[in-house]
């Protein structure tokens, strides 16, 4: 089984928590679905470097990923950029979004880094809509009828990742 490192830069505690949760949940999902890659928070190569980028609006529900792959589509290195601050508009005004929302965004970008380029459905949808919880801990992102977390990959995404990492 291949291992890919995830190096968290100076991204603040909110993103650090979300990225750690994304790594853990993706590893569980990959294992359950037979995708033979594991994300590790230390010591592995190839490496996904994660940092925040003030150019990405906190109102957006996305990050930016650039990745270099070999001829077979396997990762050599990647750079994931996330918004510095993630916000949600509520009836009481704008507030910081919960860790669950940040986890979904981080996981989406990590899967892009692993070679999944297209946007389709579930975690890899092009459009993710904010779902405000009663409090920040309940915030989710929705792709069609699928609300996350927990993270979910479509059958197409699973097959694509299996093809890259088999």
Q: What residue spans do the PLM features occupy?
A:
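Fold-level signature of zinc-dependent metallopeptidase catalytic domains
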Residues: 1-21
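Residue-level marker of intrinsically disordered, low-complexity segments enriched
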Residues: 2, 46-48, 156
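Intrinsically disordered, low-complexity regions
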Residues: 6, 10-13, 35, 44, ...
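Metzincin-family zinc-dependent endopeptidase catalytic domain
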Residues: 16-113, 117-120
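Metalloprotease/metallohydrolase-associated module, dominated by Zn2+-dependent proteases
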Residues: 76-93, 100-101, 117-166
């Amino acid at each position: 089984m291949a291992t890919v490192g995830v190096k968290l830069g100076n991204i603040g505690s909110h993103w650090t928590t979300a990225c750690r949760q994304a790594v853990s949940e993706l590893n569980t999902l990959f294992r359950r679905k037979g995708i033979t890659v594991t994300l590790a928070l230390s010591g592995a190569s190839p490496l996904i470097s994660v940092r925040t980028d003030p150019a990405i609006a906190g109102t957006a529900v996305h990050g930016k990923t650039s990745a270099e792959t070999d001829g077979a589509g396997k990762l050599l290195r990647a750079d994931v950029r996330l918004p510095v601050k993630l916000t949600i508009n509520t009836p009481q005004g704008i507030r910081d979004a919960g860790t669950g929302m940040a986890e979904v965004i981080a996981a989406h970008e990590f899967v892009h880094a692993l070679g999944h380029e297209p946007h389709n459905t579930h975690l890899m949808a092009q459009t993710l809509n904010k779902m405000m919880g009663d409090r920040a801990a309940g915030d989710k992102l929705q792709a069609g009828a699928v609300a996350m977390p927990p993270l979910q990959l479509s059958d197409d995404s699973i097959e694509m990742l299996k093809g890259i990492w088999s």
